[in-house]
A protein has these predicted regions:
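Class I S-adenosyl-L-methionine
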Residues: 1-104, 110, 115
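Beta-strand/loop-alpha-helix module characteristic of Rossmann-like adenine-cofactor folds
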Residues: 3-7, 75, 103, 113-165
């Protein structure tokens, strides 16, 4: 079976990775990802083939990973935190429609919001909101509306990407 794992590495490398993430990386022949994330784990998986690229090359990286999987190599697309929270899972799934023979497996990771809350001794209880301040894909007025709504709801708010355009 042609398989692409989309793996959340957690908040900073091997210490924050789940056992499932480590297992997916061990099973993979190819690891694809942003250069800085690959550098975090390269020492632990030196025998793997690495396909890396720089920031803003997300679509290109997804295609590289999907092509490697399509060629029959079990592949892992790595991202920081959780693959589904501002990670690569959504983009991979949308592009995977062009690769119907490739099974995409999402491997959850620990988000920066949850890790940060734990380190601060401030558990996120009784509901919380996670909001990205990046206006690259979301208009600024929509972000501001979300912030006002979360504040009005008296939620603890975890903010991602504090700088943008």
């Amino acid at each position: 079976m042609k398989r692409l794992f989309v793996v959340g590495l957690g908040p900073g490398g091997r210490d924050g990775m789940t056992l499932e993430a480590k297992k997916a990386l061990e099973q993979s022949e190819v690891i694809c990802g942003y250069t800085a994330y690959a550098d975090l784990i390269r020492e632990d998986y030196p025998e793997k083939e690495y396909l890396v690229s720089g920031m803003t090359k997300e679509v290109e990286r997804c295609h590289m990973a999907l092509l490697a999987a399509q060629d029959g190599k079990t592949t892992a697309m790595i991202c920081s935190g959780d693959a589904g929270v501002y990670g690569m899972a959504g983009l991979v799934l949308s592009l995977a429609e062009k690769y119907p023979e490739t099974e995409v497996v999402i491997v959850a990771g620990v988000t920066a919001a949850l890790s940060g809350a734990a380190r601060l001794g401030a558990p996120l209880m009784n509901d919380f909101a996670v909001i990205s301040l990046s206006d690259l894909l979301t208009p600024k007025d929509v972000i501001e509306k979300r912030l006002r709504a979360a504040a009005a709801g008296d939620f603890s708010i975890c903010l991602y990407t504090p700088s943008s355009k």
